[in-house]
Structure formats: structure tokens, C-alpha cells
């Protein structure tokens, strides 16, 4: 859940291997009244209008990674403990699925996702959490679970995975792997999944490299589809375009800035700069807001 206080900043890691910050600074969520609503184990739940409070793997991961970055900066025992409570949740809630593991959303979601459903974003962020736990502890159980979490990236949606395709056949990992409707190709979810693959490559000596290369190549080719000439699109859907909210537009910029640094692909950096320039024009911000309102009137957002 995003708020008007969101400030996404990219954190570029140093050349040193090993313990590293998460690439998007989520520390603001710990200090600006963000609703974490922790359970008795110190794990956050998320409020949904339609289904009440639920465990959301991405919410748990965000809390873990926010605490991780603060821990690295301050060496706070409390933030370290908060991080490992979420690590425990990911280990305890990793569900076997064939050769892999998944983290499930245990409630129905609009558009045809039925309990339990999975998401590339949850898988990617879970991998990022466990890779950092492994780097700090060298506990092989964390790394093994992270390895197995990649399996659904290789499976098509019709096979129970999260792998979709752009019209040109390129890979797109799906945040919302709808089984009975065209894929939505949500950009930020795909990018979070790529961060997970990048982390696994770093922690596991190149494991997942083939999948990572296919995803980076596909996004490099298809990224221009998310450009609206005045703003970025949240997803690729037929009909009325869906401009990103200002928060998600800023997140796209931060994610692409990091991806440019980690892959060396110039198109990601160039696109981030172009989208940053869009944001500076009041007319673009107004057009994006109007476009988002129009899209939501015609396509109410699930909550």
C-alpha cells in the first residue's frame, strides 16, 4: 500500500560482494506513521476493504527490507530482530509446489485470482529477503529456499507459475497471474522479481543467470510500451491506458535507475531520466492524474 508520504530512493550497492542494502530505500515506512499492524510475532498484516486484515507476502517483505537497511546503517539490534522475524515467516510459510516453493496469498482477489494465489513480486522480494539473511548468517537453508522460489518463474501461468509473455513472446513475470484473462504485465512487480533474481545471482555464484538474462532482454525490448509520452504506465492493458500514480511513477524511476546500474543496460537509465523529466512538468502530472481517474472509473481498483 502506497501513501502520499512515499519517497522512493534508489540505493546503489558498492562493488563489494556480500552484505548489501536493499535497492529501494523503504526506511521512510518505519518513521512516517505507516500502518504495519504487527501480530503477536512481530509480523505485519495488511488491511483490505474486501477481505479484512490478511498476511501479504509483499507487506512482510517490505517490513523486512526496511528494517534491514536501517540495521545496516545503524547496527540496531531491534531492527535486526525485526528483520529476522520476517525471515522466520518466509521460512515457515514457504509452501512446496513441485520442485519449488511459493508464498501464497490466502484470499480471493478481483479479476479471477482464487485462494491461494501467488505473485512474481512476492517470490522476488522473498528471495531478496532470504539472500540477505544468508549473507549475514551463511545458513544454507535460507539460500536453498531462495533457489527453490525461482522455480515458478520458469512455469507458465497455465502451469501454475507466474511466467507470462509480451506480444512478441518475450518473458514477463506477472504480479497478478490471472488464469482466465490476458496478462496485465504490471511493471513494478516484474522489476521487484528481477531484483530477486539479481540477488540470487550475487549470493549463489550465478544461479538463475539464464532466467535473469531472458527477463532483462525481454524488458529491454518491451520497456518502451510502458511510456505514455508524458508519464509511465502502471501496467499494459487493452483499452484505456492506466497511468501510474505519482508514487508508482517515482518507484518506476528508482527501480530502473538501480536496474541500469546492476545490468549496465543503458535503456534502463535513459528511460528513468526521461520519466523523471516528465514528472517536472505540471501539465504532465495533471494529465497523468486525469488519466488515472478515467481508468479507475472504468476499471475500479480492487481493494
Predicted feature descriptions by range:
Residues 1-303:
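Glycan-recognition and catalytic cores of secretory/periplasmic carbohydrate-active enzymes
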Amino acid at each position: 500500500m502506497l501513501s502520499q508520504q512515499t519517497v522512493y530512493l534508489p540505493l546503489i550497492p558498492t562493488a563489494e560482494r556480500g552484505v548489501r542494502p536493499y535497492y529501494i530505500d523503504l526506511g521512510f515506512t518505519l518513521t512516517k506513521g505507516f500502518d504495519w499492524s504487527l501480530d503477536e510475532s512481530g509480523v505485519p498484516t495488511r488491511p483490505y476493504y474486501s477481505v479484512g486484515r490478511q498476511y501479504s507476502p509483499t507487506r512482510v517483505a517490505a517490513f523486512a527490507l526496511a528494517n534491514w537497511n536501517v540495521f545496516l546503517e545503524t547496527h540496531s539490534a531491534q531492527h535486526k530482530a525485526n528483520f529476522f522475524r520476517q525471515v522466520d515467516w518466509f521460512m515457515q510459510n514457504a509452501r512446496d509446489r513441485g520442485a519449488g516453493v511459493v508464498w501464497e496469498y490466502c484470499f480471493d482477489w478481483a479479476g479471477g485470482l482464487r485462494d491461494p494465489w501467488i505473485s512474481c513480486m512476492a517470490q522476488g522480494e522473498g528471495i531478496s529477503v532470504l539472500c540477505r539473511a544468508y549473507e549475514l548468517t551463511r545458513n544454507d537453508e535460507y539460500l536453498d529456499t531462495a533457489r527453490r522460489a525461482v522455480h515458478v518463474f520458469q512455469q507458465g501461468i497455465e502451469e501454475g507459475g507466474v511466467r507470462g509473455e509480451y506480444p512478441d513472446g518475450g518473458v514477463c513475470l506477472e504480479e497478478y497471474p490471472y488464469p482466465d484473462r490476458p496478462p496485465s504485465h504490471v511493471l513494478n512487480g516484474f522489476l521487484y522479481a528481477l531484483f530477486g533474481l539479481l540477488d540470487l545471482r550475487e549470493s549463489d555464484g550465478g544461479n538463475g543467470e539464464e532466467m535473469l538474462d531472458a527477463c532483462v532482454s525481454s524488458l529491454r525490448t518491451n520497456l518502451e510500451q510502458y511510456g505514455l509520452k508524458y508519464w509511465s504506465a502502471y501496467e499494459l492493458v487493452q483499452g484505456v491506458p492506466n497511468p501510474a500514480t505519482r508514487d508508482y511513477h517515482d518507484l518506476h524511476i528508482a527501480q530502473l535507475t538501480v536496474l541500469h546500474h546492476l545490468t549496465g543496460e543503458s535503456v534502463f537509465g535513459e528511460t528513468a531520466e526521461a520519466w523523471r523529466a516528465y514528472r517536472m512538468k505540471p501539465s504532465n502530472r495533471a494529465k497523468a492524474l486525469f488519466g488515472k481517474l478515467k481508468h479507475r472509473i472504468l476499471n475500479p481498483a480492487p481493494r
